[in-house]
A protein has these predicted regions:
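Family-specific signature for flavin-dependent thymidylate synthase
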Residues: 1-328
């Protein structure tokens, strides 16, 4: 069909920023991360579906699966059995959780969408002008003035080039965006069933292999799950050793020596320091949080403070639930 200039132009769903000078706010990459639970089953719904599924197997009559015939504690104990594979685990696949993950750098984005079990919706980069999007800086770089200045300049220069290419209208936003750095931020919606969500948390809490941002995402998501289903405290455990790291850090190479089958970035954290190793077995001769810039101020890092605060909240939920169940 031909163009018709008598038609009124549509209202585009995005803001056009042609000719605007780029603006950039910089944030600490960990302090900027937020996790919001935007949709989930209620505790009552989870207890109900777990009871119905588990009791169906040996029921003589369809009414025998009615959760109204038992106590709340029995319903909770049944859900614990489901969560820990002591009963039919299928109910976990019936319970969906949707999170909004914001303040993510594009490095975190690549890690998250690699988890194939989730369903995702993304903040667009193709036909949305990115010239005013924030950027993040790791604490170690913030503690290194000579590197932080260069970091900021590279971000600002790349965003200016992006804006100028877009403004030319001879280069589309689709092509111009390729110049932008990974430290630009975005948000994603992520939906997982409970079974895959618990697996995601268990995998991403590993401080030896996973980056600090992933560790915090796991802790924040765990906190949100426990606020809905305190029964999940029987499954979620941030104090256990990271056994993939432990088992792959130093293994026989079949030639009389040893090699690594995993990620040997740092020395083991205290909870993982349960095997013998040589100091040179890792890329860095230190633990992760000891590497904190050329002007390392010492003391607790941003990660440590956020991590410990969140785990304290999680422990409080676990303690209250165990008291409710009559446990010490």
């Amino acid at each position: 069909m031909p163009q018709n200039k008598n038609l009124n132009p549509i209202s585009l769903p995005m803001d056009l920023k042609f000719g605007h000078e780029p603006q950039t706010e910089f944030y600490n990459n960990l302090a900027h991360i937020k996790v919001e639970l935007v949709d989930s089953p209620t505790r009552s719904q989870a207890l109900n579906v777990a009871w119905q599924y588990v009791k169906a197997t040996w029921a003589d009559h369809h009414d025998d699966t009615n959760p109204n015939t038992t106590s709340l504690k029995e319903l909770s104990a049944n859900l614990e059995d489901v969560l820990n594979f002591r009963a039919l685990p299928t109910p976990m696949e019936c319970l969906g959780f949707t999170f909004k993950l914001s303040g993510l750098s594009f490095q975190e984005v690549t890690h998250i969408i690699r988890h194939r079990a989730g369903s995702f919706a993304a903040q667009c980069t193709g036909d949305r002008d990115l010239r005013d999007d924030p950027a993040v800086i790791p604490e170690a770089v913030q503690n290194s003035p000579e590197f932080e200045d260069r970091w900021i300049k590279l971000v600002e220069d790349s965003k200016l080039l992006y804006a100028e290419m877009c403004d030319s209208k001879d280069i589309s936003m689709m092509d111009a965006r390729m110049i932008l750095p990974k430290c630009m931020t975005s948000f994603y919606l992520m939906r997982l069933n409970l079974k895959d969500l618990l697996g995601f948390i268990a995998q991403r809490q590993d401080m030896q292999i996973q980056p600090a941002a992933d560790n915090l995402l796991a802790a924040y998501m765990a906190r949100e799950v426990l606020n809905v289903l305190p029964e999940a405290s029987s499954r979620i455990n941030f104090g256990k050793p990271d056994m993939h790291y432990v088992k792959t850090f130093r293994v026989p190479d079949g030639k009389g020596g040893h090699t690594s089958r995993g990620t040997n970035l740092y020395w083991p954290e205290p909870k993982n320091d349960i095997f013998e190793y040589h100091p040179e077995d890792s890329i860095y001769q230190s633990r992760r949080e000891d590497i904190n810039g050329t002007n390392n101020p010492g003391g607790d890092t941003v990660f440590t403070k956020l991590w410990e605060d969140t785990l304290q909240e999680i422990e409080g939920i676990q303690k209250s639930y165990n008291q409710y169940m009559g446990r010490k």
